[in-house]
Regions:
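A cross-family glycoside hydrolase active-site/sugar-binding cleft signature
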Residues: 167-169, 200-204, 223-227, 262-264, ...
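Auxiliary Fe-S-binding modules of radical SAM enzymes
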Residues: 30-54, 284-367
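Cysteine-centered iron-sulfur cluster-binding motifs in ferredoxin-type domains/subunits
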Residues: 116-125
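Flexible, acidic/Gly-rich N-terminal and inter-domain linker regions that tether
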Residues: 2-111
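Conserved radical SAM core fold
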Residues: 172-175, 206-209, 220-239, 265-270, ...
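Structured alpha-helical segments in the cores of large, soluble enzyme domains
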Residues: 152-159, 210-215, 242-255, 350
Length: 367
């Protein structure tokens, strides 16, 4: 059988199995599919061999079919795919050189949002804001020029009068990426002893063991995103279970990492008050004392879009519809957010629940 026929056969079996998992809510089975991630094809810019990481990835995936591309941002074959192919497109791995290094000012938990070693993800959260940026092409892209990117962060920190914090995970999930590239280990090892600056990154994954023994000097803050198990099951396909995320928070606290907890995104399904009340109680009952003492919180309500809905309807026909016209209003071009009074009610409720269980912990913001 030719390679092309094998790939088509694998794709058909994969999509049938994935949709069966969605129909019957078999989250563990979906996690198995994602955790066994091996790209069905590599799409590589032709200059990645000039970089150490590029050569390492080519060696690691030597048996995977390869397609040479001119630009990771413009793969015509991918752009022509249909929305129903979204999940299958996530099985590709794109490798290139990041050409844009623009730091975007930020006023939440960092001073700058920094483009770093990856964008996109192998998981399939139905609300992912990267879909707004990349449409159905929100697959994982790895950038091999990590030395250039980290060097700019270090120089910017060194030349600043104040101590800066850089958000390096706004375009991807670096805990997930680390399982493929070891980039987060490399980053922490090369940043920890610099005289100025801090790094921060969010994650929905629990695979933190590789970074626990590192000498981080308190310069890297890991923020774990949590949601009720029902939401994870129905919406956050291919991410870690709530129990495992909480265990990861405890491990990070014990390893003296600064930690944050994102309750995000808050999704107002029918029984949302019960779900999020139980979530906050679960955190209180299962976080260790060290984590409970030091963690700060962020609360983010879901923003949705026409693009999300179009892709989800075709790619995941058995999944929940997150669009609720009774609760949502338009925001900008093709985006939806919860109506102001609905969001205000949600914030009041969540702040009340947080006061019950975490009265002494800082809530950085609610948006």
């Amino acid at each position: 059988m030719s390679i092309l026929k094998k790939l088509k056969c694998q794709k058909k079996k994969y999509l049938i199995y994935l949709n069966k998992c969605l129909k019957y809510k078999l989250l563990d089975n979906i996690l198995w599919v994602i955790s066994m991630f091996k790209p069905k094809a590599l799409y590589c810019e032709n200059n990645i061999e000039n970089y150490v990481l590029g050569r390492e990835l080519l060696e690691k995936y030597a048996d995977v079919p390869k397609v040479i591309i001119d630009n990771h941002n413009n793969i015509e074959e991918m752009r022509k795919k249909q929305n129903k192919d979204f999940a299958d497109m996530k099985r590709n791995l794109i490798i290139g050189v990041r050409k844009t290094h623009k730091f975007v000012p930020n006023h939440k938990t960092s001073d700058f949002l920094v483009p770093y070693t990856s964008s996109g993800c192998t998981a399939m959260c139905m609300y992912c804001y990267l879909v707004c940026n990349y449409n159905k092409c929100a697959y994982l892209r790895l950038f091999v020029n990590r030395e250039e990117m980290l060097d700019k962060i270090i120089r910017t920190a060194q030349n600043s009068e104040k101590d800066l914090t850089f958000e390096i995970g706004s375009n991807s999930d670096l805990i997930l990426e680390n399982t493929i590239t070891n980039n987060l280990v490399w980053t922490i090892e090369n940043f920890a002893n610099t005289p100025k600056g801090h790094l921060t990154l969010p994650t929905k994954f629990d695979m933190v063991d590789d970074i626990l023994p590192l000498k981080h000097n308190g310069k890297v803050t890991i923020r774990i995103s949590v949601n009720p198990e029902e939401i994870i099951n129905k919406v956050e396909f291919g991410t870690s279970r709530l129990k495992n995320r909480v265990q990861a928070i405890n491990k990070l606290a014990d390893a003296d990492y600064p930690i944050g907890i994102l309750i995000a995104p808050v999704i107002l399904v029918e029984n949302w008050k019960e779900l999020y009340s139980n979530l906050i109680k679960y955190l209180y009952e299962n976080l260790n004392e060290k984590a409970k003492k030091q963690a700060f919180f962020e609360i983010i309500f879901m923003t949705y879009s026409f693009v999300h809905r179009a892709i989800n309807t075709e790619a995941f026909p058995n999944a929940i519809d997150l669009y609720n016209p009774e609760l949502m209003r338009g925001r900008g071009r093709g985006k939806y957010m919860y109506k102001d009074y609905i969001r205000e009610e949600g914030e009041k409720f969540l702040r009340g629940e947080m006061q019950k269980y975490f009265p002494n912990n800082q809530i950085e913001y609610v948006v």
